[in-house]
Amino acid sequence: MKTFVAKPETVKRDWYVVDAEGKTLGRIATEIALRLRGKHKVEYTPHVDTGDYIIVINAEKVTVTGNKFKNKVYYSHSGFPGGLKSTTFDKLQAAKPEMIIEKAVKGMLPRGPLGRAMYRKLKVYTGTEHNHAAQQPQVLDI
């Protein structure tokens, strides 16, 4: 019996909507990363992007446990000497709530061209509105 290898042109990709309201950040991010990679599919192949498209709504209502709301720190660097910037979870949630889910999921994806292709299939929105009604996304309960 031969080993099945998925081909990029034959992979069927579905669209899913995930409501992040009241969900824990890490638990929702792991499931999203798993589906972006395609590991939930039978035809999963490590070197082929077999994942689905994921739309996340209500990104501003995601929660964290414990003291992480005040203590979790996100870092970024401008590339210049002394250019390290840091912000806490609550400040980032007030300013850019989409970035919280994006950073959590991106850290769970592989580094390199394949990981970047998987990351591009993630769409995160604040509120309940999104621009992908034409794709007829299915609701995904996590």
UniProtKB/Swiss-Prot annotation:
Keywords linked to the UniProt accession: Ribonucleoprotein, Ribosomal protein
Q: Which InterPro entries match?
A: Ribosomal_uL13, Ribosomal_uL13_bac-type, Ribosomal_uL13_CS, Ribosomal_uL13_sf
SUPFAM superfamilies listed in its UniProt record: Ribosomal protein L13
Which domain of life, per UniProt?
Bacteria
UniProt record, GO biological process: negative regulation of translation; translation
GO molecular-function annotation terms? mRNA binding; structural constituent of ribosome
Q: Which GO terms describe its cellular component?
A: cytosolic large ribosomal subunit
For this protein, the record's CDD domains field holds: Ribosomal_L13
Q: What does this protein do?
A: This protein is one of the early assembly proteins of the 50S ribosomal subunit, although it is not seen to bind rRNA by itself. It is important during the early stages of 50S assembly.
Which family does the record claim for this protein? Belongs to the universal ribosomal protein uL13 family.
- Describe its partners and assembly state: Part of the 50S ribosomal subunit.
The record's listing under HAMAP family reads: Ribosomal_uL13 (MF_01366)
Q: What is this protein called?
A: Large ribosomal subunit protein uL13
Organism listed in the record? Pseudoalteromonas translucida (strain TAC 125)
